[in-house]
Amino acid sequence: MNIFDRKINFDALFKFSHITPSTQQHLKKVYASFALCMFVAAAGAYIHVVTHFIQAGLLSALGSLGLMIWLMATPHSHETEQKRLGLLAGFAFLTGVGLGPALDLCIAINPSILPTAFMGTAMIFTCFTLSALYARRRSYLFLGGILMSAMSLMLLSSLGNLFFGSVWLFQANLYMGLVVMCGFVLFDTQLIIEKAENGDKDYIWHCVDLFLDFVTLFRKLMMILAMNEKDKKKKK
């Protein structure tokens, strides 16, 4: 029998039998909201970089933080759903604006960094998300303690580097941060599944977790590519 004659069963490929139908519906809402966040964040970044109508700064950072706190403080219900979606969109927009200075820096070094970083982030995020969805339930939840310890270590080293100014330590933090965020994609995806299985259907807040994972991954990868490109130019 010719192996190329075999048909691929796509229904079986995307079948998550270990996840209940209600949780699968919840995940659809989470990723639909995530897609909305990506679109709105892209609009925010575009406005900063191209139109300069709104510039990233202290006000945009405080606005983003304020909207996130407001969203967190607003209880999830059918009555507040539209309001919370509006808060989510506002948060995503200001987060996109906040990426502006990093985008400007990368464009100045090499504009091709941006599509490369975005495609790389999308591939990493998709692969680790699928790994978490296909894996046995709760199999990655043990990562929580490890990831928080790693984040604490990175924070301490970053604070220490304010005094030492070590380029090597800065680079190590970037690469370690990239690995840690990959772990958070696994952890957060499975945590969302477990929360949904236990009755927590707040898909808007669950979307925030994944959106922040993606944005942080993108920022780390973008900075790594920019740093490597700058080193190449110095060698030339």
From Swiss-Prot:
Main location: endoplasmic reticulum
Subcellular location: Endoplasmic reticulum membrane
CDD domains in the record: BI-1
Gene Ontology biological process terms in this record: apoptotic process; autophagy; cellular response to unfolded protein; negative regulation of apoptotic signaling pathway
TM segment ranges: 30-50, 53-73, 87-107, 113-133, 140-160, 167-187
PROSITE patterns named in the record: BI1
Top-level taxon in the UniProt lineage: Eukaryota
Keywords annotated in UniProt: Apoptosis, Autophagy, Calcium, Endoplasmic reticulum, Isopeptide bond, Membrane, Transmembrane, Transmembrane helix, Ubl conjugation, Unfolded protein response
Keyword Membrane: yes
Pfam families, per the entry: Bax1-I (PF01027)
Lumenal-side positions: 51-52, 108-112, 161-166
One GO term describing the cellular component: endoplasmic reticulum membrane
Gene Ontology molecular function terms on file: calcium channel activity; endoribonuclease inhibitor activity
Post-translational note: Ubiquitinated by BFAR, leading to proteasomal degradation.
Biological role: Endoplasmic reticulum (ER)-resident protein that confers cellular protection as an anti-apoptotic protein by limiting multiple stress-inducing pathways surrounding the endoplasmic reticulum and mitochondria. Inhibits the activities of the key sensor for the endoplasmic reticulum unfolded protein response IRE1alpha/ERN1 both directly and by blocking BAX/BAK binding. Modulates ER calcium homeostasis by acting as a calcium-leak channel. Negatively regulates autophagy and autophagosome formation, especially during periods of nutrient deprivation, and reduces cell survival during starvation.
Similarity remark: Belongs to the BI1 family.
Oligomeric and partner information: Interacts with BCL2 and BCL2L1. Interacts with ERN1.
Protein name: Bax inhibitor 1
The species this protein was found in: Bos taurus (Bovine)
Species classification: Eukaryota, Metazoa, Chordata, Craniata, Vertebrata
